Design a protein with these regions (language model features):
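Glycine-rich dinucleotide-binding loop and its adjacent helix/turn
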Residues: 154-199
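A conserved short coil-to-beta-strand element within the FAD-binding core of flavoproteins
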Residues: 116-132
Length: 199
């Protein structure tokens, strides 16, 4: 455990916290840490359909609207990874979901304040120090971190109503598992879609 507390620790690494990691890393005097339980960034892997785009233009990447000069912009990623001209030639301001995921993975590889395989098991607040102690389970054992502030970005959990689960759980799936069960769905004689979300 470090003696000096972090200014903030963020738990979970989706696009929101990844954006915060990009914007906070270059700030002098701000000590931050981003903890993620998975082994790498993987944005909605069960929903990576071929040819599907984001619903917002590329300028709403992780940083551009807050800091257009950031080295973590999508355009910088595209230039450094020989993707700028293919993106331009595609003639769409809307990123493919797969390209966005690759962009986010690239950003993670550039950041020094991101730590994977850190499953947070406990958070305790100490009145005396006015700090939180964050306990994580890692492949190398238990880790403890101290921070003045917490940022939670754990994202929503897939929800299937009890009545659907009880009816026949083998035939019910959440859209987040769609690509993982695509062959099974293609073989099905009937498919019913219930509910929808925009976003």
């Amino acid at each position: 455990m470090s003696n000096q507390p972090y200014d903030f620790i963020a738990i979970g690494l989706g696009p929101f916290n990844l954006s915060l990691a990009c914007l906070s890393e270059p700030l002098e005097g701000v000590k931050s840490l981003f903890l993620e339980q998975r082994s790498q960034f993987d944005w909605h892997p069960g929903m990576m359909l071929e040819g599907v785009t984001l619903q917002t233009p590329f300028m709403s990447d992780l940083v551009t609207l807050a800091d257009p000069t950031s080295k973590y912009s999508f355009l910088n990623y595209a230039k450094l990874n020989n993707r700028l001209y293919p993106f331009y030639i595609r003639e769409s301001f809307f990123l493919l979901r797969k390209e966005y995921n690759l962009y986010c993975q690239w950003v993670c590889s550039q950041l020094s304040n991101v730590s994977f395989e850190q499953s947070v098991t406990k958070v305790e607040f100490c009145q005396q120090s006015e700090c939180y102690t964050v306990t994580c389970k890692t492949p190398n054992g238990e880790q403890h971190y101290v921070t003045r502030h917490l940022v939670l970005g754990t994202g929503p959990a897939p929800y299937i109503p009890d009545c659907a689960v009880q009816s026949n759980s083998n035939n019910v799936l959440h859209s987040s598992d769609f690509c993982h069960r695509l062959d099974e769905l293609k073989a099905a004689k009937r498919v019913t879609v219930v509910g929808a979300e925009i976003g």
